[in-house]
Structures are given as C-alpha cells and as structure tokens.
Amino acid sequence: MPSIEAVNLTKQYGVFTALSDLNLKIEGTKCVGFLGPNGSGKTTTLKMFTDLIKPTKGQALINGVNVHTQKKKALNSVGTLIETPEIYPSLTPKEALTMIAEIRGIPSDERKKRVEEALDEVHMEKWINKRVGKFSKGMKQRVCIASALISDPAIVLLDEPTTGLDPRGMNEVREIIKSLKGKNRLIFMSSHILSEVSDVCDEVAIIDHGKLIVYDTLPKVTAKFSGGNNVVEVALLRPVDNKVVAKSIASLPDVISAQKIDDKNLKIIFSGGLDVQERLLNDIVKLKIGIISYKAASSELEEVYLKLITATL
C-alpha cells in the first residue's frame, strides 16, 4: 500500500517558520488535495517530500523510507511535478520524455514503451512527434504530467498542476488526474482552488501558516465544520419536475432539503456520513430521473475552508 508521511516536519528560514511540526500520514490509492492559501506551506511540504529542500527538523517518509537519508530508495516509486519545468520548444514529447526516462534510469529497451504509455495516459499520443513549441499551455502541462508518470509510479506528487491554464486546459488536466485515480496510485496534489479539490479529490488536508488544520474525507470535513450536515450536487440528463424534487427526493431518509439549482441540477442537504451518501445515491438512481453526476458541493467546502482559515488569522 503506497504511503507518504510527515513526522514533526518543520522548515524555518531564520525567524520565519514556513512549516511547523507537520504530522500527516496518507495511505492507500486515492487523491488527496493539499489545500491552503498562497504562502501557507504547501510547496515547502512537497519540496521536502522530494528532497529539493531539507527540513529544519522532522522526517518526510515515503513508503516508510526517509527521503533525506535514503533518497534513491524513497523516490524510486514516486513521480513529481513541482514548479512546472519548461520543455525546450524544439523538442517533441517523444524526445523530451526519452531523455527523462534515461535520467530516471529506465533501461533502454523499455524507454520507448514507457514514453508511449505515459503520453497515452495524458491523451497526447497523437502529438508524440510534434514540436512542443507549437503546443498550448494545457498541452505542455499534459506533457509535464506525462514526465511524472514515465516510471509508472505508485505515488504522484503534483504542485498546483492547473495554475496558469485557461478553463479548457484546467478541465483537461483535472480529467487526467481523475483517470489516474483508477490506476492504483496515491496522488497528493496541492491547490488553492476549492472547486478543483472538491471535484477531483477524495480527501483534503487544509494547511495555513505552516500548520495542518484538518485532514479527512471531504464529506467528513464539511460535516464536522458546517453543523453536521452534508451537501451534494446532482446533475441530470433532462429537466426534472418540481413534484419529483419535492415529494420523491425531499422525502428520502436523512434528506433535510432538496432544491433545484436550475432545470438539470439539484442541491440536496442531508445528515450523515459516507454510508448515508452512498445510500442516497442508490435511492436517487432508482427514481430513474437521468442522473449523470453526483458530487459534494464545492460551496460547502468553501464555507468550511473560509471558516478554518479565518480562525487562524
């Protein structure tokens, strides 16, 4: 089971503390969002997990191995994208990734296969022999993510992977990250975009002023800090009748209220945890109203986030 763990991880620059006694253990194949405002310590943490900077004290462990004393062993199963590198515009994805594969120590007889597989994962196989200089920012970012996947890692560390992208590029990268979750990987992704974390991640760790505030599943975090209730948004294939919302959905067990956001989107407030959320989804599917997506509402995470961040000021 892949794991990353911070044990009393601290980084000081003179009198300034960038990270303070961070204790965080993440295990299993899932996507965890590392959420916090700019300057909160997110990038500092990721850089210590990749040995780009040394901690003042504490340990950064990957699969139980100390990154700073056994770097090669610890990072052997890790792919990283920290501070997005610029790929030479004259290179093709194939050329750039082949060089990275060589640097990573991938045997020469395996490089071609790994390059093709990594580009396929980010849906860039059609551009394998095109010059990077002609790519959009989103396409370049997908190639950079492919570079993190070149060794087929069990753990992927991403530092704000959608920063600087237009809405289309952001959506493309988020969809790629979602697809990576289904391939038995642990993804630890920093972000300051609440809707992104809500859409992509299974769990969230919130940090501010170098200190961890909370780490749990999204439903548990929103329930714990928003009065014990959870909110889900449901997208439908076709418009739903008001009577169905009022009678069939609002009357389901543990549902506090159900209302239409618009003709094809619903907001449902319910009490309970993941087990209730699972049952609620099954109950709604049985109504045969054309459900096409079901997710925690980002507005609830925003409310919790602002409440927690304000409390640390």
Label each residue range with its predicted role.
Residues 2-6, 11-189, 194-214:
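ABC transporter nucleotide-binding domains
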Residues 28, 126, 236-238, 272, ...:
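Non-catalytic surface loops within mature trypsin-like serine protease
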Residues 78, 177, 225, 308-309:
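Hydrophobic aliphatic residues
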Residues 174-267, 271:
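ABC transporter nucleotide-binding domain
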Residues 270-313:
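C-terminal coupling/interaction segments
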